[in-house]
């Protein structure tokens, strides 16, 4: 009798690419590519900006999945990138899920990178990267929010792997870099005062633009009552940036803090509508 052939688990793979340009005083589509589980939808907007909603049609990621996103915002464009739903990161039996995002913004362009939260499940494994190249006079807002399980669903996360790698450059010069790693006993790590102090929801906001100093006071006032959260202003390689770290007890509390901050940095515009659907 012949031995049964080993069958590798099916894994999700997807690649999406969007190019935006200006035309008729509006930001318009110049190129769109979708493959595998990566989908991009462009809802109607009622101003000069463009909004793109990213969809992972596999319904989440697990070990071995691969997703790649690439976005080009042309001169003078205004592009908002968000996701249809929170990205669920499920238990990984083998390997690590990899999600890579690349964004380039040309002269006088602006991009808001505002995905909804990533939800980590117990024994999940995700390695994520964000690479951004800005023209010297382009501006950029980025948010990444993470939930270590969902309190309302009674979920707990004991162990797993989460890596987040950011590199933001302007005119080729590095203006922001960070490497976050939660590995092994995430529950014990997150309980430390210097990490999350037992909280299960956290986010990072980065804003690169000339008007950082004017926006800073209101951000500091908004975060003053949240002991584990804070905001700072830096000048790096000729560019101003704001970095805000937000920690909350759960996802609902995190959104209550984040939405006013995002609206302030977007000059009064709220979060993408898909966040509220």
Curated annotation (Swiss-Prot):
Matches recorded under Pfam families: UreD (PF01774)
Gene Ontology CC, one term: cytoplasm
Organism domain of life: Bacteria
GO molecular function terms attached to this record: nickel cation binding
Signal peptide per UniProt: none
Location within or outside the cell: Cytoplasm
Alphabetical keyword list: Chaperone, Cytoplasm, Nickel insertion
Oligomer status and interactors: UreD, UreF and UreG form a complex that acts as a GTP-hydrolysis-dependent molecular chaperone, activating the urease apoprotein by helping to assemble the nickel containing metallocenter of UreC. The UreE protein probably delivers the nickel.
Task performed by this protein: Required for maturation of urease via the functional incorporation of the urease nickel metallocenter.
Protein family per UniProt: Belongs to the UreD family.
The protein's name: Urease accessory protein UreD
Species the sequence originates in: Sinorhizobium medicae (strain WSM419)
